[in-house]
Amino acid sequence: MYSGEPLSPFVENYLNYLYETQPTAAAFDGVHQYDDLLEDPSRTVLEGQGRELGGLVRQLAAVGKSGMTKTEQVEREMLTANIRARIFELENIRSWERNPQRHSEILATSLAGQVLFPYAPVGERARRILSKLKQTPRLIETARKTIQDPPGIFIREGITSLNGVVEFIEHDLPRALTSLDDMHLLSDLADASTEAVTAIHGYTEYLRNEVAPKARGSFRLGRENFDGKLELEEGVTLGADRLLAIAQRELRETQEEFRSVAGRLGGDVASALERLKQDHPSAATLVSTAQ
């Protein structure tokens, strides 16, 4: 890429890169050429992605602003922040080595994407589900090797999330594939499901019995990382102290408004909220009321 090249080719290249490395996100964007795959969250791969994203930042910097519209210039800055935020997550926040829930979310979302959206015949989607289930033991083994000293709350939430994935595989997937009449494929799915569930159960037991008792990690990001996420992901450069002051001011103003409205209703905030609860439609009429 050279200075002055239009922005569009870079955007296309960047999207292709994201789709190749994040097949689940690709599926939710309607790109299904990677649907047979699960993400590879191994240390080697993710550290390599950090370097590759750094190269993309440099490529984008070489796209000259001259000839760009104002909108394109803004988009260029947004793209830069987006890529830098991904690098920041990989290299600074490093949730991929701290949070076992991340791996369960990859698997759950990837499987759900094939169930929820009938973009292809059920047989085709079932074969892609089969492929993902066969890759599940590898994903779980990667989690076992990669996660280091996770905070206790991350362990508890990870176990809960992984148990939810097991429930999905054992109960929701069969219901979603009731129209599938390929007995050979159904048999393969049953076998792959059993192997996937066995791997997940083994990992949750490992987390519960070996990792949790020794967990000393902190869930806190720290001020520097918190400010970095705000700037790169939200475009907010005010800093934590300033944001806290704004939040406290807004809280006080909101509380005062609550008290004022409650007073006009002839009571305190608690009694006003109780009156609102009594005016709530029943479960049977909730949808029709909203309509």
Residue locations for each model-derived region?
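N-terminal maturation segment of proteins
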Residues: 1-291
